[in-house]
């Protein structure tokens, strides 16, 4: 990493801290409790943007589930992450602004009895550029066959493995992303979790 990149990171972090302090002064951030209880999407995603990827993902999951009215389910059910009020099972895949500028879908478990995959890319520099996609289980199977790869292990190591976890990486702004948006864009869900 060069000093130029470090300086940019410091500037970005400084701008986020200023914005967070402004939100606090306006009473948009509670003094205690979990960040996912914040109501305004832009405020929530700005607050968690200063955390690590490992810290952001679970908070974002809780926020999205609360906004959608979904219930967290036990991983032992092998039916994804959440159950909807309509009794559908959802696997949520979220990713945030990153150096590569990609939507990273990791640990796609096609053997699970999931009805839908909700794939969310949060652009932390401009929330309006965020992407929300909804795929059926069958659509995800098709996409994994086209552009997926095993998350762990080699082809030889996975030859006899029936439960292979897959990954898909899509560059934001690429022709592939444009195709996914055309096929799987979920504007109603996007409005609920990110706003219009």
Regions found by a protein language model. Give the residues of each.
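Nucleic-acid endonuclease domains
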Residues: 1-196
